[in-house]
């Protein structure tokens, strides 16, 4: 039987698995071998499918003609090609084994499973609605739907019809794939299948955004879109192009498209899409990870069983996979002749783990921080910047940095012996100054002054739109007033209805502020001083706002007040402007 697991420990990677009676650890469960003397790792759901032993890859090749008769030449995850003793084989993720076509590799690559309907070993395409067979790659088709390239880590060609092996580039002019080892024929993609996934594979790597997760033994890396993808190896190095990654203890060389280390050189790896973090809600406060089942504990609290649609045992301590029965006297889950031992439960947490717990920052000083595994380096401005590798060498130009052991050269290069790589560009560090009272919080580290709106910027950080409740435009450079739509092509803010906007009530001005009104009264920065109906200075929460005659309301710049001051009428189409600027935390006095 299975114990209910903690989502916090699960997400933080603290759950090492199940310890078998012989001392070994397994990710899901332990099963007795046929002889009954030894234990091996198993998954009761996977073990009900047809199973055969995988074969070792043997000998390098470039085409099927380089392999013995009945063998196939397969591309491995490391970028090399090897002979598989099946006429139509599938390369396993460990890079050393292969399975026949129609089968899927086990996690350790030593077994092949033949699965029907929707195999768990399938590659899930972004959006989680379509999937490709194991050892395939998701690529966009001509019609915008998802297609499958029949090899792992493939390169998707720009024509949206063809693809090339990992490490090769598409030469559409000559209809071929070009790689350092030679040329290959372009491969055609086939349509992806609709996902009908009943059970999810366990994920134990939650990315810093707390919205994306990656499989165990992989690494979260940021993609060009700002979202997170998965590098298919643990403790990987995320390359600065946001497309590739390299093994641990290597350096990304984007000029040569290689991963460099002291002893060897390998091809860059392409990141895979991450999976959305989803929850199974037990009640309004407690949830379990996707693919788990909520079960009550003896205390009445909720616990998490690591299988979808699981059977909760009557002892309120254990659970079994779907289709199994709880045998509390034996302490097993049984389905026919198959028996597996049980484990103990733990309490389900109240919420998802805080991403700041999973990924601690690197402090530069008391007020500035860089992401984990980064190095703090000074910028030309004198502020702190972040070099995206640990223990880096900060170059004297205050723009670049180099890996540990390398020397900074002119024009942004790094050298170590005969090896030369491109230097990495620093990014601005995050300010950790706490929010001032009244400021608008963008995230844990950044805020905008009151009366403004946080908008994402081109740099991937936050910027401030100098309008309250504004609409942030898709180009990440502009913003429009609330209720308007950005027309990026026409560079205008548009509204389908009439040119009317409700006015804003004035607030009494403080004694101290940034904008001097007179008579000892001030308003905050990006506000406008207006006299109220009593003749006392008050503050309009718009920069260059228009004061209404009623002494109670005001309108944004570019509008004028109606006769009664109950409406803001637009004089003309709002001017497209560069509203965004860098956010600066300010005290409100």
Curated annotation (Swiss-Prot):
GO CC entries: cerebellar climbing fiber to Purkinje cell synapse; endoplasmic reticulum; extracellular region; extracellular space; Golgi apparatus; late endosome; lysosomal membrane; lysosome
Tissue-by-tissue expression: Highly expressed at the wound site and diminishes away from the wound. Not expressed in fibroblasts and endothelial cells in intact skin. In adult brain, expressed primarily in neurons and in resting and reactive microglia. Expressed in both neurons and microglia. Highly expressed in activated microglia in response to injury. Expressed in macrophage.
A Pfam cross-reference name: Granulin
Record PROSITE patterns: GRANULINS
Principal location listed in the UniProt entry: secreted
Record-level Gene Ontology MF annotations: cytokine activity; protein-folding chaperone binding
Disulfides per UniProt: 125-138, 132-148, 282-294, 288-304, 295-312, 305-319, 313-326, 320-333, 364-376, 370-386, 395-408, 402-414
Residues carrying sugar: 38, 263, 373, 526
Cellular compartment(s): Secreted; Lysosome
GO biological process: astrocyte activation involved in immune response; blastocyst hatching; embryo implantation; epithelial cell proliferation; locomotory exploration behavior; lysosomal lumen acidification; lysosomal protein catabolic process; lysosomal transport
Keyword Secreted: yes
Induction: Injury-stimulated induction in the fibroblasts and endothelial cells and by inflammatory cells entering the wound. Injury-stimulated induction in neurons. Strongly induced in activated microglial cells that surround motor neurons after peripheral axonal injury, but not by astrocytes. Up-regulated in response to a cortical injury. Up-regulated in activated glia during normal aging. Induced in response to inflammation.
Deleted gene: phenotype: Young-adult knockout mice are healthy and fertile, grow normally and show no abnormalities in hematogram or serum chemistries. However they show increased inflammation levels, impaired host defense, and neuropathology. Knockout animals displays neuronal outgrowth deficit. They exhibit increased neuron death and microglial activation upon central nervous system injury (CNS). Conditional knockout mice exhibit a reduction in dopaminergic neurons and increased microgliosis after CNS injury.
Endpoints of the signal sequence: 1-17
Keywords: Cytokine, Disulfide bond, Glycoprotein, Lysosome, Repeat, Secreted, Signal
Modifications made to the protein after synthesis: N-glycosylated. Cleaved by ELANE; proteolysis is blocked by SLPI and is concentration- and time-dependent and induces CXCL8/IL-8 production; granulin-3 and granulin-4 are resistant to ELANE. Cleaved by CTSL in lysosome thus regulating the maturation and turnover of progranulin within the lysosome.
The family this protein is said to belong to: Belongs to the granulin family.
Name listed for the protein in its UniProt record: Progranulin
Species of provenance: Mus musculus (Mouse)
Gene: Grn
């Amino acid at each position: 039987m299975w114990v209910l697991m903690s989502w916090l420990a699960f997400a933080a990677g603290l759950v090492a698995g199940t310890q078998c009676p012989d001392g070994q650890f397994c990710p899901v469960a332990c099963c007795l071998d046929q002889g009954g003397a030894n234990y091996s790792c198993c998954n009761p759901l996977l073990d009900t499918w047809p199973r055969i032993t995988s074969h070792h890859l043997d000998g390098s090749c470039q085409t099927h003609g380089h392999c013995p008769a009945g063998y196939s030449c397969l591309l491995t995850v490391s970028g090399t090609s090897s002979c598989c003793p099946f006429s139509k084989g599938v390369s396993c993720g460990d890079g050393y084994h292969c399975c026949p076509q129609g089968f899927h590799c086990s996690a350790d690559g030593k077994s092949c499973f033949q699965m029907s309907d929707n195999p768990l070993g399938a590659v899930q395409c972004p959006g989680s609605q379509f999937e490709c067979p194991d050892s395939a790659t998701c690529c966009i088709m001509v019609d915008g739907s998802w297609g499958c390239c029949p090899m792992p880590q493939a390169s998707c060609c720009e024509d949206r019809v063809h693809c090339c092996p990992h490490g090769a580039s598409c030469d559409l002019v000559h209809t071929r794939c070009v790689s350092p080892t030679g040329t290959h024929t372009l491969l055609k993609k086939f349509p992806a299948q609709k996902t009908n996934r009943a059970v999810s594979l366990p994920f134990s790597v939650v990315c810093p955004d707390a919205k994306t997760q990656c499989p165990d033994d992989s690494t979260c890396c940021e993609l060009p879109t700002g979202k997170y993808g998965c590098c298919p190896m643990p403790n990987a190095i995320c390359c600065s192009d946001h497309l590739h990654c390299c093994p641990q203890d290597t350096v990304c060389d984007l000029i040569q498209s290689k991963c460099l280390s002291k002893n060897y050189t390998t091809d860059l790896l392409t990141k895979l899409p991450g999976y959305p973090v989803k929850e199974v809600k037990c009640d309004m406060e407690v949830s379990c990870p996707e693919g788990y089942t909520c079960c009550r504990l003896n205390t009445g609290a909720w616990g998490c069983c690591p299988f979808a649609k699981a059977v909760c045992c009557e002892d309120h301590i254990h659970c079994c996979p779907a289709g199994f029965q709880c045998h509390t006297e034996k302490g097993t889950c049984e389905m026919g002749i198959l028996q597996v031992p049980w484990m103990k439960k733990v309490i389900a947490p109240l919420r998802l783990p805080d991403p700041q717990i999973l990924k601690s920052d690197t402090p530069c000083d008391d007020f500035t921080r860089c992401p984990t595994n980064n190095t703090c380096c000074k910028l030309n401005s004198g502020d702190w910047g972040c070099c995206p590798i640990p223990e880096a060498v900060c170059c004297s130009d205050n723009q670049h940095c180099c890996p540990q052991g390398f020397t900074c050269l002119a024009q942004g290069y790094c050298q170590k012996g005969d090896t030369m790589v491109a230097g990495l560009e620093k990014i601005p560090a995050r300010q950790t100054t706490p929010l001032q009272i009244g400021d608008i919080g963008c995230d844990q580290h950044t805020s905008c002054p009151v009366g403004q709106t946080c908008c994402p910027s081109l740099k991937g950080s936050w910027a401030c739109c100098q309008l309250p409740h504004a609409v942030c435009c898709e180009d990440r450079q502009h913003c429009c007033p609330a209720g308007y739509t950005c027309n990026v092509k026409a560079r205008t803010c548009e509204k389908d209805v009439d040119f009317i906007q409700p006015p804003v009530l004035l607030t009494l001005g403080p004694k101290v502020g940034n904008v001097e009104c007179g008579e000892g009264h001030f308003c905050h920065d990006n506000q406008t001083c207006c006299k109220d109906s009593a003749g006392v200075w008050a503050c309009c929460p718009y920069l260059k706002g228009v004061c209404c005659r009623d002494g109670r309301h005001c309108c944004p710049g570019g509008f004028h007040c109606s006769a009664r001051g109950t409406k803001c009428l637009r004089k003309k189409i709002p001017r497209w402007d560069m509203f965004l600027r860098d956010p600066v935390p300010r005290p409100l006095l």
